Curated annotation (Swiss-Prot):
Keyword Mitochondrion listed: no
GO MF term set: argininosuccinate lyase activity
Major localization class: cytoplasm
One GO location term (cellular component): cytosol
Subcellular location: Cytoplasm
Reactions mediated catalytically: 2-(N(omega)-L-arginino)succinate = fumarate + L-arginine
Signal peptide per UniProt: none
Protein's recorded name: Argininosuccinate lyase
Organism: Pseudomonas savastanoi pv. phaseolicola (strain 1448A / Race 6) (Pseudomonas syringae pv. phaseolicola (strain 1448A / Race 6))
Family: Belongs to the lyase 1 family. Argininosuccinate lyase subfamily.
Gene transcribed to yield this protein: argH
Length: 464
């Protein structure tokens, strides 16, 4: 990347060139060049509008548009030289345009500042990123629905405090993650609505003296509405913070899911098997099969949390309007979007390939007195107050711990020593199937409800 030229667009009032280190220190082109497509898109719309209001001729507009399209092709072919001395993506493209088409290229920036230009670029870029992320969320949710449908009757232990609590189905467990991702989807859709306000036309901070048509530019760029205040237009980064907030919540969900997958693949659980293509080995221990994908996603969540805090800290002390501080908004935003999209892609590929180990999960559900609440509910139906039933079953569990017997393994005589309300029909209640089937209401773990929830989920995805 060249640094041997000094051709800043703002050099007129300066008596000496910028220090070479300062030029590198203040340049952003090393990372904001990824905005090139959206920068060119915004410039084409701006040139089109300038021609409509008579600031440019139609011929000048056409020359500019052709030049910008050629530059985009150069960039995408890898034939474009990014120059640090030109600071950023905007000036690199404008300088190249002027090289190609001459003085007409210098007219493109009429009625525009880099302040509103970059604010527009970032919004256009993030809008596209959100659309890609939403697609990955949907793909992951489709995988979860597939697992839930296949495993609607697969019983596993449900946990609280990571201790066995009650039996649930694996399908029901997968649907819990589906629900969280649905909220993530909604948050990102809402974020997209608020970012889709056009700042272009705000110029440096106060607007412009040219007779611009912001409504036309807004329509050309696909924004929903023109921003209503030029000061806010160039200085607002709420949309980036809101995106990083939504991304942080989504990554928190993926991190929690990752923790479960890491536990479930361990020798201590062995609930699931991950295909080899999602794992790696050890350079010293031949037996190792490490769940690197969920471990990395769990770790990468911290990067996105950091991006959120970085942007909040970046903005908290800035007066209106634009400040150079805002150059620091891009790297955390870019990284947060990349990390979330890659993590979702990894999960969307991996989740459909998970293979539950049915026998092991069932055996685990049989341990830990997982049907104790069912016994208490059984006694409630016999007319006893729940708190009394809770204490009765607590004594039965204590007896089970001492004798090494689960509730279903005790004889009727053993159970009746805790309550004479217990009859032979209690054993149907104490089975794993009896427990999950009894929770047959919307949101419950019964297989019938799992299948109904899958249908609702499929309808939700089809309506997007």
């Amino acid at each position: 990347m060249s640094t041997d030229k000094t051709n800043q667009s703002w050099g007129g009032r300066f008596s000496e060139p910028v220090d070479a280190f300062v030029a590198r220190f203040t340049a952003s082109v090393t990372f904001d060049q990824r905005l090139y497509r959206h920068d060119i898109m915004g410039s084409i719309a701006h040139a089109t509008m300038l021609a409509k209001v008579g600031v440019l001729t139609d011929a000048e507009r056409d020359t500019i548009v052709d030049g910008l399209n050629t530059i985009q092709a150069e960039i995408e072919a890898g034939n474009f030289e990014w120059r640090v001395d030109l600071e950023d993506v905007h000036m690199n493209i404008e300088a190249r345009l002027t090289d190609r088409i001459g003085i007409t290229g210098k007219k493109l920036h009429t009625g525009r500042s880099r302040n509103d230009q970059v604010a527009t670029d970032i919004r256009l870029w993030l809008r596209d990123e959100i659309d890609l992320i939403l697609s990955e969320i949907t793909r992951l949710q489709q995988g979860l629905l597939g697992q839930a449908e296949r495993e609607a009757e697969t019983i596993m232990p449900g946990f609280t405090h990571l201790q066995t609590a009650q039996p649930v189905t694996f399908g029901h467990h997968m649907l819990a993650w589906f629900e969280m991702l649905s909220r993530d989807y909604e948050r990102l859709v809402d974020c997209r609505k608020r970012l889709n306000r056009m700042p272009l036309g705000s110029a440096a901070l106060a607007g412009t003296t040219y007779p611009i048509d912001r409504e036309l530019t807004c329509k050309l760029l696909g924004f929903d509405v023109v921003g209503g205040n030029s000061l806010d237009g160039v200085s607002d980064r709420d949309f980036a913070i809101e995106f990083c907030s939504a991304a942080s919540i989504a990554m928190m969900h993926l991190s929690r899911f990752s923790e479960e997958l890491v536990l479930w693949t361990s020798a201590q659980f062995q609930f699931i098997d991950l295909p080899d293509r999602f794992c790696t080995g050890s350079s010293i221990m031949p037996q190792k099969k490490n769940p690197d994908v969920p471990e990395l996603v769990r770790g990468k969540s911290g990067r996105v949390f950091g991006a959120l805090m970085g942007l909040l800290t970046l903005m908290k002390g800035q007066p209106l309007a634009y400040n150079k501080d805002n150059q620091e908004d891009k790297e955390p935003l870019f990284d947060a979007a990349d990390t979330l999209r890659d993590s979702l892609r990894a999960f969307a590929d991996m989740i459909p390939a998970i293979k539950p180990r049915h026998a092991i999960m069932r055996e685990a559900a049989l341990r830990g007195f997982s049907t104790a609440t069912d016994l208490a509910d059984y006694l409630v139906r016999r007319g006893l107050p729940f708190r009394d039933c809770h204490e009765i079953v607590g004594h039965a569990v204590k007896y089970g711990v001492e004798t090494g017997k689960d509730l279903a393994e005790m004889s009727l005589e053993e159970l009746r020593q805790f309550s004479n309300q217990i009859e032979q029909d209690v054993f149907a209640v104490l089975t794993l199937e009896g427990s999950v089937n009894a929770r047959n209401h919307i949101g419950g773990t019964a297989p019938e409800q799992v299948r109904a929830a899958v249908v609702r989920g499929q309808e939700l995805l089809a309506g997007r």
